[in-house]
Each structure stands twice: as C-alpha cells, then as structure tokens.
Amino acid sequence: MSNELSANWGSVNAACQPLVDALVADAQTLQIEISTLTNGTRIIDAGINCPGSLEAGRRIGEICMGGLGTATLGTNSGFANWPWSVNVHARTPVLSCLGSQYAGWSLSHKDDNGQFFALGSGPGRALAGREELFKELGYKDQADSTVIVLEVDKFPPVEVAEKVAENCGIKAENLTFILTPTASIAGVMQIAIRVLEVAMHKAHELHFPLEKIVDGYGVTPVAPPGGDFMTAMGRTNDAILFGGQVQLFVNASDDEAKALAEKMPSNTSSDYGRPFAEIFKSYDYDFFKVDGMLFSPGKVIVTNVNTGKSFSAGELNQALLNQSFSL
C-alpha cells in the first residue's frame, strides 16, 4: 500500500478517546467496573467480576474500531431463530479494521503465579507499531494515552501493562485495558462487531490490494454466550462463519472484484461444514492446524464502484448456526 493513502489518516487514539471517557462515565448503568493496577494503569472489567452488558460490548466494539466505526443493533440477521443482529460500518475500513480493531498484538507474561496470554486489539496497536502489518499500512499513530482491548477472563499482570506502555511510548497511568471475556455478553457482542474486520483480514490474506477497498459494511447475528470459553469461542466464530454478511466497495477491475467475492466466503475452506468447536477439537485444540481460509464471513458481496457491477458468493447456513447455538 502506498503511503499517500495512510498520510491522510487521522489519529485512531484521538478519535476513540471520547468513547472511552463515556464508557467510564456510564460504568454503573453498563454494569462494568473500573479499577487500577499498582502502576496506575486503568482496568475496565466488562465481564469478569461483573455482569457487563450488550450495550457495553457494542460500545467496546466501536472503541476497538478506533472511533471510526459504528455498530447498531437490529433484527435483520436473516435467521428466523436468531433475529438479533449487529450492523457494522467503518469509515476508512482499512485503518479502522486492520489498523485498530484486528487482534494482532501478542501479549504474554510468565511468573510464579502462572502464565498470562492475550491478543491485544484496539488503537494502542497503532501507537506501538509492533506488527509487520503497520509497515505495510505505512501508519503509526501519536498520542499521550491509549486503550487496548483484551479477550481474557483474568486481569493482566502489571508487567504486561508496563510492557504495553513502554512500547506505546506513554506513561502507564495513561494506559487503559478493557477486558471482555469471550463467554460474557459484552464479549459476544464485541466479537460479532468484528464481522467486517474478518472480511478485511481475509482480503489481506488473499493479497487483494488494500488501497482498492474504499468502503464496507457487515451484519451478523449475535451469538448467545456460552457457559465456558470453548463453547463461547465456537459460537462467536460460527456467528460470522455461518451468519456473517459483508459488502465491500472496491475501486478495481470487474475481474478483481469477482475473484475477491469468489475466494472470500467461509465455505471455500476445506474445514467448512462443522461447528468451529468440533473442528478445533478434531485438531487437538491446535489453532494453527485449522485452515486459515475458514475465518471469513458466510456471504460476501463485492461492488465495483467504477462499473457498478456487484459479485456475490457464499451462503448463510441456518442448520449449522442452530447446531452451534444449541437450538
């Protein structure tokens, strides 16, 4: 990607800071809890020691998108049994979805108390620029404070906060961690809001020129929370694999648009056809054995803004969604 496009991108940290402030201000009504680590790093617990809420998850999803996306609730999922849906649109989708929302920062720490591991998402990634992706995007944000979202069911040790603050070039007290357990109601909501990001990541994996993607939106059912991590992880993946719908608007040739549509849907994967929890178990819970092409929306429309032609591929699979959601 040329730096000409990213040169016009604003700060994802500046854009999302008002959303973080509002989340903290409304903590009581959102059923989330605010605390601090010993080094001053702020913790927003959205489901570990508190109930959390769907609205908290919706807001956290917009924070993940760097303040450049909107997530609204509706009943147009396309599934009679699971009408509750989330509609996602991102301004500057490459920056919002890949430069902020994508969970690409691997964070870990091991001590006598055990091991902590999480994949960080949110605008803090663009401050640290630790991933190769940011070299390709030609983007690095600048800010005095930041936020990272972690899909975890326990608090991060202070050492992780120190590492993140150092990598971001900020004081530890200016760092916020938002914690969203996968099995929580806030967790299933913020994962559903990743439906467009999943499509953007797949486009990147398919080596489609990112600068040719000019806009996009997605819709997906919101998975019922699972009672345990494995069930919840399966359901949140399946919501997008079997129920996610995305439309991308591209500035490309018709051949490029058609090829992207045909290659993107989840049913192009050799692992498609079973709930994700079953697939994961069959590979002895080794995530890296799962076909990477599986992680895609169920149905895709690619519209060429030059010619006005649209190309559609994939399917919505109600039977597999019902099986995954335990109906």
Q: Can you annotate each of these PLM segments?
A:
Residues 1-164, 168-169, 173-197, 201, ...:
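Anaerobic metallocofactor- and corrinoid-dependent redox/one-carbon enzyme cores
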